[in-house]
Amino acid sequence: MAKAKFERTKPHCNIGTIGHVDHGKTSLTAAITKVLAETGGATFVDYANIDKAPEERERGITISTAHVEYETEQRHYAHVDCPGHADYVKNMITGAAQMDGGILVVSATDGPMPQTREHILLARQVGVPALVVFMNKVDLVDDAEILELVELEVRELLSSYEFPGDDIPVIKGSAVKALDGTNDEIGRNAVLELMAAVDSYIPQPERPLDKPFLMPIEDVFSISGRGTVVTGRVETGMVKVGEEVEIVGIKDTRKTTVTGVEMFRKLLDQGQAGDNIGALIRGVGREEVERGQVLAKPGSIKPHTDFSSEVYVLSKEEGGRHTPFFANYRPQFYFRTTDVTGTVELPEGTEMVMPGDNVKLGVKLIAPIAMEEGLRFSIREGGRTVGAGVVSSISK
């Protein structure tokens, strides 16, 4: 009897299957659970159960995603699979299911198709660190030369989107054979080979605690006789009493010292990733700091106004706009804890953006925000979410 609860002693990693419709992403997901179930590293989840992925709402957007978990000798994995192309786009842009790496599934009978290309581009834009390729359905191709050509095509495509196409592991196999257990060479063994590649090629993600200290400011209080307290949830890293930090965003960056940390009215000597804390800061007046700024380790993050982004625009059905928007559209961009107005620049040759579209937008904010590539944001009009995006590159 497989244990229902995994022992979380191994390092954890979030991955997902991406690729063109009907190339076998869901079959492969099922096959991985079946093969790893033999060693007690998973509970077998069949195709039908993964395919009827439940709907979730993330930032007001409806996304269908299936989650399975399994473990190898090396790691514990949370694996996400989406039923439809639109779900992938929304998932990757909102970061609803964080991906530390991806398994790109390409059918040997078709080779790379439009969504193969689109998912690779999305992975590049939203900062998925590494991909591994599973060439599926090799049982349907008799000619070994065709397999070589498909592999070459996939590698070239990956390189064209700045992934290391020559180095990425490409494993050839058949998810269906792994599921029905009829041909171990391209079935079970290929899945084991794939998981070994995922274990070794996808880098172990850095834990939030190991990153530099960052806390988005949610509220500011003044405590008579003590000074100014800023509250928020520590996103990454840790802060100790007596350490110097910077207040970044909206106004000029300034340094201060954290002279006290409290949580649930108790004084602590430090606050760390995941904690909701109040930080007492020295020499800063109540009116000199505001929601939307961040407290951060000095030099670790800079404020910016101009960036390009990958954006999903909510459809009318999702409660988004009913009409398209054009160049110089001026909505609010919601970063972490606050809205900042910004102007939008459309890609060359794009006249307008329709609700339901996925588009690359240039943005110019009226005030600088502490940001880095990969930061997620919402686009809002009068408090209503009309889009979701991720910073893909910073220009100013």
Swiss-Prot record:
Recorded catalytic activity of this chain's protein: GTP + H2O = GDP + phosphate + H(+)
SUPFAM superfamilies per UniProt: EF-Tu/eEF-1alpha/eIF2-gamma C-terminal domain, P-loop containing nucleoside triphosphate hydrolases, Translation proteins
Naturally occurring in which organism (per UniProt): Rhizorhabdus wittichii (strain DSM 6014 / CCUG 31198 / JCM 15750 / NBRC 105917 / EY 4224 / RW1)
CDD domains: EF_Tu, EFTU_II, EFTU_III
Positions contributing to GTP binding: 19-26, 81-85, 136-139
Region G4, annotated ranges: 136-139
Span list, region G2: 60-64
Protein name: Elongation factor Tu
GO molecular function: GTP binding; GTPase activity; guanosine tetraphosphate binding; translation elongation factor activity
Catalytic activity, EC: 3.6.5.3
